[in-house]
Amino acid sequence: MEKKKLPFGLKNKEKLTAYNDEKIHELHRQLKAKIEAKKAKEKQDSKTKDTDKKVDQTPKVKVPFTKKFSNLWFGIDKEVNKIVWVTSKKLITIFLLIVLVSAIMIGIYFGINHLFIALGVFKGK
């Protein structure tokens, strides 16, 4: 019976179990035990991580709308005290600034309108 040729020059290798040396077998058993212990520990760690994830991913309890509304309503008094209210001086300044900007915009509009009427583009009343 002919041996099959392996592609790319691969050779048949002897397995470790083919050796009769007891020291090699003992080392092999020790390494196998260490690897199995490590895999068991990793499996246990992954289980604890999975349980931690499950605890973190617990669904939130839905609060009814009336409860949310009452919490909002009764919590407003705390929020009102936290709000920084504008001072009267700043309020007057902001109001005058808005009036000034509005007056400038109205002046520009009526100025352009009067210019068009003077040029005859629009007919006056």
From Swiss-Prot:
It is a single-pass membrane protein. The keyword Membrane applies. Residues 36-57 are annotated as: Disordered. The chain crosses the membrane at residues 92-112. Keywords: Membrane, Transmembrane, Transmembrane helix. NCBIfam families: secE_bact. This is Uncharacterized protein MG055 homolog. It comes from Mycoplasma pneumoniae (strain ATCC 29342 / M129 / Subtype 1).
